[in-house]
Amino acid sequence: METINLEKPLYSLKKFYFPSEWSYPINKNYKHIKDTYNEGVSCGIFEASNEKHFAYANGVLNCVTWFYPKYDYEQCMVAASIMLWIFVLDDFLERDHMTDEKQQYCVKKYEDILIFGKDSSYISNIEYNDLTPLDKYSLILRKRLLNPTIHRIESFNIFIHYLREWFFSIIPLKKSKGNNHDSVPIEVYQFIRTINIGLFFVVGVNSVAVRTNVHGSFWLNPIWNRMVRSASRQIIIFNDCVSYAKELNHDCAGENCLYILQKKLNLPFEKVYSELIAEAKQCIFDIQNDEKLLIKSLSHISEEEMNGVIYLVEQLHEIICGNRDWALMTPRYIHKDSPFIETNGIDSLFVPYETILDPNLY
């Protein structure tokens, strides 16, 4: 495990560029956090009175208040159900006891349950009370996704596609770093990480939680997809900087672009950080330019649908800025040995999210 030289000067994450007009006040709806946690309790994922379990869930679910500042309670519940499911599944698949065979079984099983529900061949012959905690919660999630899309099934299908792409990227990302934990080519890392960061489904939540009136084909629009990829890259860079110390400490630096580039390019931290700052800023400029191209290319659509497109563009802005604010406070990323002044000295060990999950969850 590598360590950070604390005698070196601290750097600042304020060098990242975020347009001031993209920020939006945090969502004041918090009820979804406790209600979603209680659903997890009812399925057996969490224990009702376990403070560590609630701290874990809160550390996951509070991202909804940052990412979706305009959502009402019901919309927050949709987003929170998704976030709890993906974080639990991601953390569970990273457990040391998970063999390659178990990992493959899990991703295939939960893909099937999301598609077919109780008719999935994995659980169709099992009584509900005998299902595993994650089986039960997957059914809750599926129902919550279906309810608002009952008359627009293409929205449900689009979102399931985004979820599927994400959870099939978990294992390749872990494998890509190789046995030396720093052997992944940066191009391979960037390709897999763009999917694994999950922004396509984070933005795609709007396809089920919000009636935007955009046609289903919009989600395939190449300009829109390029905007989401640019945003993904910006978020990857920012999150990798915030989580740099924690990933070094946990021997996960092989998945961190700030670390990978130091190794591959044989450049000092400060030089790599400056280059990443410039790249992240260019991503913002690319998004701003593509916004204009997107609106111009869709000049033929109705005013109602255009309003939906504008809503989604603004939501992309809100997620980028919301991620900044959430990343700087979530115990999933921050670490007391951070080389950045904004998070240095903050101890996040009170939420041991890597170890609290029941090994019999699935």
Swiss-Prot record:
It is an enzyme of class 4 (lyase). The keyword Plastid does not apply. Induction: Expression is detectable but at low levels in vegetatively growing cells and increases during development induced by starvation. Expression is highest during mound formation (approximately 8-12 hours after induction), starts to decrease at the time of slug formation (approximately 16 hours after induction) and further decreases during culmination (from 18 to 24 hours after induction). Its EC number is 4.2.3.-, 4.2.3.106, 4.2.3.15. A motif (NDxxSxxxD/E motif) lies at residues 239-247. GO terms for molecular function: metal ion binding; sesquiterpene synthase activity; terpene synthase activity. Belongs to the terpene synthase family. Terpene synthase that converts its substrate farnesyl diphosphate (FPP) into an unidentified sesquiterpene as a major product, as well as beta-maaliene, aristolene, calarene and 2 additional unidentified sesquiterpene as minor products. Is also able to convert geranyl diphosphate (GPP) into a mixture of monoterpenes including (Z)-beta-ocimene, (E)-beta-ocimene, allo-ocimene, linalool and beta-myrcene. Contains several highly conserved motifs that are important for catalytic activity including the aspartate-rich 'DDxx(x)D/E' motif and the 'NDxxSxxxD/E' motif, both of which are involved in complexing metal ions to coordinate the binding of the isoprenyl diphosphate substrate in the active site. This is Terpene synthase 3.
